[in-house]
Amino acid sequence: GPHAPDATYVDHGYDERLFDTGEVQLNHVVVGDADRPALLLVPGQTESWWGYEAALPPLAEHFQCFAVDLRGQGRSTRTPGRYTLDNLGNDLVRFVDGVIGRPTIVSGLSSGGVLSAWLSAYAKRGQIVAAHYEDPPLFASEVNTSTGPSLRHSIGPVFALMSKYRGDQWSVGDWDGMLAAAP
């Protein structure tokens, strides 16, 4: 995030900008002409706008693209313990208001697809005109799934170990302690 040394990041060929939501700074890039429809690209968990880098040139032929790092990702502000759908979604509502400023198409990958669905339901009236959800894990964390184990049952214990021993995203933490605690 903004507190990380620039040496951590490599140049990606687009001018990265920061938008202050009032709580966090969201890193993002804007590619394409402003007279084209607005397209907000939302990456998956632990990803960055960089995942959209190869897709930006062809998309920019038809859209003005806004690719964003969510809080805790890329150069955006870290907020340990505050990564909820409502917090992430409201960051994006503020981003659409403060940066895009017009009706927007939203497309999200994986957990970014879940956020796209969240925006479809909870964004301000008129902000989102269309939404695309690419491989969203909408039912992956059901407590009692109809068939087979849920994400919470299978990988949930690993996430708990990572949270306890590794710390927040991007920190080094206690790798040896985590390995010793693993079943």
Language-model regions, residue ranges each:
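Alpha/beta-hydrolase fold catalytic core
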Residues: 1-39, 60-63, 100-103, 128-129
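Active-site loop/oxyanion-hole signature of alpha/beta-hydrolase fold enzymes
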Residues: 19-22, 29, 57, 67-107, ...
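Conserved HGGG/HGGXW glycine-rich cap/lid loop of the alpha/beta-hydrolase fold
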Residues: 24-78
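Conserved acidic functional residues
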Residues: 44, 91, 134-135
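Active-site micro-motifs of SAM-dependent methyltransferase domains
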Residues: 47, 72, 113, 138-139
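Hydrophobic side chains within alpha-helical segments
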Residues: 50, 94, 136-138
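Flexible "cap/lid" loop of the alpha/beta hydrolase fold
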Residues: 118-121, 127-168
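Alpha/beta-hydrolase
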Residues: 152-153, 165-183
